[in-house]
Amino acid sequence: MLLMKIIDQRYLESDNRYSTQPCLLSILELEPVTEAATERLQQRLYAALPGLRRLHGLVGKRADEVPAVVELVQQTAIELRRLALNEVTLGFVGVVPRMPGRYRLVLPYSAQSAAAPALAMATQLVNAMLAGRSFNLKAGLARLRALADRRRKPRGSLMKTARTLLMSVIPQRALALPFFAPRLS
């Protein structure tokens, strides 16, 4: 039972049409969800992620035609990033014109390596809770932290290490090419 899925994602550089920060633009496809199911989902999410209560109304710009469950996905992604990366952002949620059931989510980020996985994890968590299944939240948060830590390691030191390894393998003496004198005949 797949209620929602991410059908497209793009990374936007800073100073884009939505934010001055770099953003992840995602298109979410959603099957209709009843109001009662959305209410149960919200209560389960609040129990699993108590910080979601603070995010209600702080999500940023939102279109009126967007179902509450899409806003819950966005709030969940923001809360997961806050818990895993200590990253607080506001986002944008809107409808995709002339495409019923598709919604645009824009989430600014500081750790690009964890932006898309955080949204994917949020959709998996929401799908699991809508279906009444459990979800290993601790493992997901640990994975997001690991992805963000990978970004923090300086690439310069990795390049120096790679260069040192290559230099130890490559012979130090210059290769001599045979000298070809022009023929005079």
PLM region descriptions:
Residues 1-185:
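Preference for protein termini
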